[in-house]
């Protein structure tokens, strides 16, 4: 019969190797997505045309690729003059029905707590007691026309800022009820971009099949 000490030792080794396997898998995913930057580049022309048509800033925009893991560089600041990625950061998706840490679900319905796809105008900057610095968004497509009524924002969360260093797939949380929730560091970069722009800046969210 195995002693209690032996049983505890066996369980300890199991959890050690289990955690080690998760870490190896996580870093493998992170390495894969760091080199897969072309998922942003394929949208450069489309977003520039939207910016040009609407009279928005034609030099910079923000892309959010929901086909990338939430803890990875899913959100990107794009330089449309040089066709390059300036900065990247994580972006949590909504926690509503049909969502998981691995797969986002999308909706334009009020109360759905889901993320929405399409083009958004980054509107006024403000502050709130719950999320701090935030930017309002106006939906420009049928897929996100309720963005204002749903109070969809760009804001940050310390949870996202910490967890994206630990996992490629952020566990669902109240960090996002459909908002584009990024790290505090990434939000500061977005703020600097918006503050110096005399024209509205476009945010474009998509998911590749």
Residue ranges and their predicted role:
Residues 29-177, 184-201, 206-209:
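Cell wall/extracellular polymer interaction/catalysis modules
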Residues 2-22:
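N-terminal Sec-pathway targeting helices
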Residues 5-8, 27, 174:
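Compositionally biased, low-complexity repeat tracts
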Residues 15-35:
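Alpha-helical hydrophobic membrane-insertion segments
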